From Swiss-Prot:
Start and end residues of each stretch annotated as Large ATPase domain (RuvB-L): 4-184
Binding site for ATP: I23, R24, G65, K68, T69, T70, E131, D132, Y133, R174, Y184, R221
Protein name as it appears in the record: Holliday junction branch migration complex subunit RuvB
Assembly behavior: Homohexamer. Forms an RuvA(8)-RuvB(12)-Holliday junction (HJ) complex. HJ DNA is sandwiched between 2 RuvA tetramers; dsDNA enters through RuvA and exits via RuvB. An RuvB hexamer assembles on each DNA strand where it exits the tetramer. Each RuvB hexamer is contacted by two RuvA subunits (via domain III) on 2 adjacent RuvB subunits; this complex drives branch migration. In the full resolvosome a probable DNA-RuvA(4)-RuvB(12)-RuvC(2) complex forms which resolves the HJ.
Species of origin: Haemophilus influenzae (strain 86-028NP)
Enzyme Commission no: 3.6.4.-
Function: The RuvA-RuvB-RuvC complex processes Holliday junction (HJ) DNA during genetic recombination and DNA repair, while the RuvA-RuvB complex plays an important role in the rescue of blocked DNA replication forks via replication fork reversal (RFR). RuvA specifically binds to HJ cruciform DNA, conferring on it an open structure. The RuvB hexamer acts as an ATP-dependent pump, pulling dsDNA into and through the RuvAB complex. RuvB forms 2 homohexamers on either side of HJ DNA bound by 1 or 2 RuvA tetramers; 4 subunits per hexamer contact DNA at a time.
Length: 335
């Protein structure tokens, strides 16, 4: 199964971009959850505006769907500047990055998603740009080639990544602010679902908002996606009114269980229990057993399962916890 095809995938889908922009908070005052990040960014932004400086370069990391792009746009809005958006895989040539940098206005935000996927050549261009607001460009080729320096306006680079550990030390060290986004509480997600319902003019009961939230794996993007699918169900089956029973029926139809697990989650946990006697099992063996890439397990499936206490990562491999056995109605054998 392709990760992006899952209803509970934290990754963005192409057709969601327009709707997501419509319901995305624009300012910190509307930003729900991540209280420590919100408080710190409020201070940093106000201080930069008081000094009339560009905000320090900002690195945002965490699992997919937690609002890294949203936070980058909020930073630009709060600073009252423009934001230019790109991603690591798109920046193939130094000239691509140079063109973006030279078109920035003072204090503008350059947002690079998936920044861990930048090539070494692009990183070399970024170092002086981030540190000294200078751009080194090579003119000509061969023996006649020469380097010229261009001054850049003070700007803020906002980098987003799901794999902070994959960043090179020289690049990571150039970020003055580093923020980690955590999975959201059910209470915060309930508020997000209710806010999104208001933006979409939906008739949503509070209990239904909670039901969607608790199955959303701590991830706003998943919560909003499930809300839209529940809306479809309600439009067809209940005159557009999203009650608690309608929400439960719709989510059951979507094969999202009470813990927010889908078939792939249950397949992974079942494999650990049934094929490997609860573990420990190595990542490569587990990937082979369920027919998925090890990166998919490590970056997409595991974070939520570990955070929720269903899977334990040890030096010897992955282990199913007692909570996993209870979820499947099984009794864990004593060692």
């Amino acid at each position: 199964m392709i990760e992006a095809d899952r209803i509970i995938s934290g990754q963005a889908k192409v057709d969601e971009d327009v709707i997501d922009r419509a319901i995305r908070p624009k300012l910190l005052a509307d930003y729900v959850g991540q209280p420590q990040v919100r408080e710190q960014m409020d201070i940093f932004i106000k201080a930069a505006k008081l000094r009339q400086d560009a905000l320090d370069h900002l690195l945002i990391f965490g699992p997919p769907g937690l609002g890294k792009t949203t936070l980058a746009n909020i930073v630009a809005n709060e600073m009252g500047v423009n934001i230019r958006t790109t991603s690591g895989p798109v920046l193939e040539k130094a000239g691509d990055l140079a063109a973006m940098l030279t078109n920035l206005e003072p204090h503008d935000v350059l947002f690079i998603d998936e920044i861990h996927r930048l090539s070494p050549a692009i990183e070399e261009v970024l170092y002086p740009a981030m540190e000294d607001y200078q751009l080194d460009i090579m003119i000509g080729e061969g023996p006649a080639a020469r380097s010229i320096k261009l001054d850049l306006p003070p700007f803020t680079l906002v980098g987003a990544t799901t794999r902070a550990g994959s960043l090179t030390s020289p690049l990571r060290d150039r970020f003055g602010i580093v923020q980690r986004l955590e999975f959201y509480s059910v209470e915060d997600l309930t508020s997000i679902v209710a806010r999104s319902a208001d933006c979409l003019n939906l008739e949503l009961e509070q209990q239904a908002a909670f039901e969607v939230a608790r199955r959303s794996r701590g991830t706003p993007r998943i919560a909003n996606r499930l809300l839209r699918r529940v809306r479809d169900y309600a439009d067809v089956r209940n005159g557009g009114i999203i009650s608690i029973n309608v929400a439960k029926q719709a989510l059951s139809m979507l094969d999202v269980d009470d813990a927010g697990f889908d078939y792939l989650d249950r397949k992974l946990l079942s494999a650990v229990i049934e094929r490997f006697d609860g573990g420990p099992v190595g990542l490569d063996n587990l990937a082979a057993a369920i027919g998925e890439e090890r990166d998919t397990i490590e970056d997409v499936l595991e974070p939520y399962l570990i955070q929720q206490g269903f899977l334990q990562r040890t030096p010897r491999g992955r282990i199913a916890t007692s909570q996993t056995y209870r979820h499947f109605g099984l009794q864990k054998l004593s060692d």
